[in-house]
Amino acid sequence: VRGLAWVTVGSMAANLCSYLVHLPASRWLGPAAYGEFASLLQLVLVLAVPALALQTVVARQVVRGAGAAQMRALGYRIALGAGVLAAVAVPIAAAGLHTRAGTAAAALAAAPALVLLAVEQGLLQGERRFGRLAALLGIAGAGKLVFTVPGLLLGPGPALLGTTVGALVAAAVGRALAGDPAGTGTAPDAGVRAVLGASSVQLVLAVFASLDLLLSRPVLGAAAAGTYALGAVAAKVAFWLPQAVGVVFYPQLATPDRARGALRTVVGLLTALGLACVAGAAVCAPLATMLAGEEYRPVQGLLWLFAAQGALLALLQGLLLYAIAIERTRMALFAWAVVAVEAAILLTLPHTPAEMITAAALCALAAVMVVGAVVTVSARRASGSRSPRSATRPASAGH
């Protein structure tokens, strides 16, 4: 419980810093430039998939006895790959998002830096040093705020470059916090292939969390996309606020005789927090125009729906973390099928922000239902393959 509290505080601090970036950005850049800025930030989330995957693999391997040197060596290889992927993606992103190549490059430069940060977070997570992990999360969020906001005065490109600097500073601090634990040496080797498997899961989550915002600019136009981007902040809050649940319970999900009980706890907590986020968005909706300006009024009444989408994606994330923990990443194929349907729908049907978020939320609900059914069947089969005593042993919630 104490670990959950620590990571919740750290995650909330990091998320608060991220959202504070959006307030001056929406005012100083204007709807059109802010839409460009927000879309590129979402693209960074997609290219941060190797980092997210690496953190889960590092945490899982540390639970099984891996040491820091082994995991950092893996991290350097993944960072190199992320840098190459980011370089290749620059012209594609510039053309697809109707932005300049320099601005796209400034955004995508964050990808390898986030990988280096993820190694240290994974080490702390796997060792259950949640107090230090919470501190690192807060430092990473503060770095993003401190280095990004001044850049807004110069435009989207310099601001986006600030996210890279913030991530590099946080990675250096994270190395000091994590130290050099040797591990037990009993963990099976996990190489790039393991990270690629986890990446398939994290990528589908990133695409789900980003697809509607990435497509809003070409589908709705620059001005409407800027309005939509502000509403998407509510989705981000609902998606990232419960992040601590997955972080704290992931080591238990990776422990066979605790996995099923931990899964039930994760689903219950994410559902409760999601409902709270939807209610909070409905109550706080009038603050949107007060904080961001009257030009964003069209999205005010939709904030609860954005929050519902984010809450559903948080629940989907919890289900797919179970897939990574038990090394059954092929479950992500079911989510990919829903993503393909969502892309087709968003490119053809919506003409307004209301229509786009409605379609995106319904697709998120469909993904939760499909993946939830697959995970339930898998958990029951795994339970049946163990002894009744070990299968029904209650999970300890981070005591």
What residue spans do the PLM features occupy?
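Helix-loop junctions and terminal segments of transmembrane helices
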Residues: 48-67, 231-258, 325
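Interhelical loop/hinge segments that connect adjacent transmembrane helices in multipass membrane
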Residues: 105, 131-136, 159-163, 169-209, ...
